[in-house]
A protein has these predicted regions:
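Basic side chains
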Residues: 41-46, 95, 197, 206
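Long, positively charged amphipathic alpha-helical accessory segments at protein N-termini or as interdomain linkers
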Residues: 65-67, 74-92, 102-255
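N-terminal lobe of the biotin/lipoate ligase/transferase fold
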Residues: 1-90, 106-108, 115-116, 254-255
């Protein structure tokens, strides 16, 4: 598996939407990035606010078969974490499953989606969109109603907007996805599990999570299993959480 094309777009509505529209133009794996995304999706229905050149928006499109496609968001969070560490010397924490935090505030968001393509839409692929906050000022997060968001620049990183977006896009392509993807496509999440656990801020903390049948459960997050599920020890036993909202006490204002 190899990423065979990376497209730079001076501006687009959404890199995920662009990849969906042009999915069949890519080979087995392809990527698109921009620093001006004008019609992204705000979290929980919030209005999208364009960072106007101060953030990186990157989407990788995959139509190769994966052993565990549902765990791609976890691999993506590790891929970004590695490259931010190399470039800026920062050690982000991961809030399960795929938010990256720096000093307790969100610096990276990831959204993976399934795609149908080809004759009668019988082909199945997956795309993974990544937004990295590079140099937005505090006023951006205030206007976007994101009290728990931050940027690398606000956290003290030296950002060069003339070179950093391209460097990060190429690094994510070559070292974040291309090389690890050989292992991930064959073996799934298991080879990356220990690295992920060490970076996961949930482990050892009290969490609240959505129950499959409705309602909420709570307990201590104690592990990540080989399928990427968050293992929570509750009063009634262990729960293996894979979907739904998970609040971590002490993070994003959760108590």
């Amino acid at each position: 598996m190899s990423i065979n094309e990376v497209r730079y777009l001076p501006e687009c509505g959404s890199t995920n939407a662009y990849v969906k529209e042009h999915f069949e133009e890519f080979g087995p794996v392809g990527a698109v990035y921009t620093t001006n995304q004008t019609a992204g999706r705000g979290r929980l229905g919030r209005t999208w606010v364009n960072a106007e050149g101060k953030a990186l928006y990157y989407t990788v499109a995959i139509r190769e078969p994966l052993a565990q496609p549902a765990t791609l968001p976890l691999l993506a969070s590790l891929a970004v974490r590695r490259q931010l560490s190399l470039r800026y010397g920062v050690e982000c924490q991961i809030k399960w499953p795929n938010d990256l935090l720096l000093n307790g505030k969100k610096i990276v968001g990831i959204l993976c989606e399934g795609v149908s393509y080809g004759y009668q839409q019988q082909g199945r692929g997956i795309l993974c969109g990544i937004g990295i906050n590079l140099a937005q000022p505090q006023s951006y997060f205030d206007a976007a109603d994101l009290p728990h968001g931050t940027s690398l620049a606000l956290q003290g990183a030296n950002i060069d907007l003339t070179t950093d977006p391209e460097w990060l896009a190429e690094a994510l392509t070559d070292f974040g996805f291309d090389r690890p993807m050989y292992v991930f496509a064959r073996d799934g999440f298991a080879p990356f599990r220990e690295e992920y656990k060490k970076a996961c801020v949930n482990i050892g903390r009290r969490v609240t999570f959505d129950l499959p049948g409705g309602g909420e459960g709570s307990g201590e997050a104690v592990d990540i299993d080989e399928e990427g599920r968050l293992v929570v020890r509750t009063d009634s036993g262990e729960e293996h959480v894979f979907t739904g909202e998970v609040s971590v006490h002490g993070i994003y204002g959760a108590v």
